Amino acid sequence: MQLCQYPSQSRIRRFTLEAIQIPIVYNQYGDYDPNGLLYVLEEDSQRIQREALKRFQQTPPQPYEEVRPLVLRVNLGDTVKICFRNPLNRRLSIHVQGLAYDVMTSDGTSTGFNPDSTTDNFIEYTWYANTEGVF
């Protein structure tokens, strides 16, 4: 029996994400992007910003190991609620691949005649983990 055939307990998983802008250092030689954009869990935001800036001020600037792509782990059948905070001075969003969502409210884009689901402050997205896989 494949994993996706087992009965699953559907639950709601909530994540509060925040967009931060920091210099992103790529390697030990100090190569960096001065305007790096990173999505992090809100509870990690201050620590990541503080530590990344501390390492950026070294000579040469050094990478911080927690500056990496955001990975959210959920189970098949879960409903995923994303509270997305954007304290930056531009409209941003988050878009998922591979999960089901309502394109009118949770697509994370501004396309066609659909309402704009980017934000300059706060928005909540709802996604459904109806497919097993890595996306």
Describe the function of each predicted region:
Residues 77-78, 121-123, 129-135:
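Short tyrosine-centred short linear motifs in exposed loops/low-complexity segments
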